[in-house]
């Protein structure tokens, strides 16, 4: 009887484990995932936030052009590692790397780093 119970339990739990692993995109909890749609309004909003915060801190006047590429990682919130194209004060388009952590439940974002590439 005990063996039948273990077999039944295994048959129930194994598919559940597979589903949970599948939801993680194959990378596991905390792994980086490429952003498939860099034009997604939420991604663009995070990139614009990064530029606005950088402009405040540095007194530069960068203007957002587009998100070139990026990854997300679930940490204590969502960590965005973005490559952003922006125009500098002279009108030249350059690429920048920004790291932003967004905590939706707290309605907060923080710019962790921003640098020219």
Curated annotation (Swiss-Prot):
Q: Where are the transmembrane segments?
A: none
- Where is it localised? Secreted
Which cysteines are disulphide-bonded? Answer: none
Superkingdom, natural source: Eukaryota
List the GO terms this entry assigns under cellular component, sorted alphabetically: cytosol; extracellular region; plant-type vacuole; plasmodesma; secretory vesicle; vacuole
| The protein's name in its UniProt record | Cysteine proteinase inhibitor 4
Glycosylated residues, chain numbering: 37
Asked whether the UniProt record includes Iron among its keywords, one would answer: no
Originating organism: Arabidopsis thaliana
Annotated signal sequence range? 1-22
Pfam families for this protein = SQAPI
């Amino acid at each position: 009887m005990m063996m039948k119970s273990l077999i039944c339990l295994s048959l129930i739990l194994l598919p559940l484990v597979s589903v949970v692993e599948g939801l993680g995109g194959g990378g596991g909890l905390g792994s980086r995932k490429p952003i498939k749609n860099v034009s997604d309004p939420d991604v663009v909003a995070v990139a614009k936030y990064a530029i606005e915060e950088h402009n405040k801190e540095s007194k530069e006047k960068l203007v957002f052009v587009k998100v070139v590429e990026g990854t997300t990682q679930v940490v204590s919130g969502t960590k965005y590692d973005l490559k952003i194209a922006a125009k500098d004060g002279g009108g030249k388009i350059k690429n920048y790397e920004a790291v932003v952590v967004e905590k939706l439940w707290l309605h907060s974002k923080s710019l962790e780093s921003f640098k020219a590439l």
